[in-house]
Amino acid sequence: MAIMDAKTTFSNQQSVVVSSGGSVVCGSTVWSGAIASGGGQVVDQGKAGDAVGQELTLKVAAGATAIVGGGAAAALQVVLQTADSNVDSAFKDLVLSPAVTVGSAGFKGSLFECRVPAGAKRYLRVVYKNSGAAITSGTINAYLTRDL
C-alpha cells in the first residue's frame, strides 16, 4: 500500500460526473491544510527539477463510489499537467493515459499509474477527460507517492 500525504494528493473522493466530451480539473488551489473529502487541489513541488533517486509515482483509482457511465462507451482519460505558475492557462499536458472504458456497469480499481517524467515544473495538477458517453456517477482518488 502506498503512503499518502495530503500535500501530494490531487483528488480525495472527488466527483468525476461529467458530460460527454467534458473534463474535470482536480482543483485550482494549492494545499493549505487537509484536503477535504470530495475536494481536489494543485500540487506545489516547491521548485522545478528532475528528482533523480526521489522519483514520484502518480496513482489514480476509483474512489468509494464506482465510476458509472451513461452507456457502454463511457471512457475516462487521466492527464497529468505541469506549469511554472498556478494559473489555468499556464498548464500543459505532461502525461496522457490511455482512455479506460468505465461502461454502464461501473468501474472500481486502478485507472492509471506512472512515474512523473523528467521535465515536470513546479506545479502539477490532474485533469480527468471523458471521451465517450457521459459519466453519471463516481468518485476518484489521485496522489503522488514514492512507491511504484
Regions inferred by a protein language model and the residue ranges of each:
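Surface-exposed, low-hydrophobicity beta-strand/loop segments enriched in small/polar/acidic residues
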Residues: 1-148
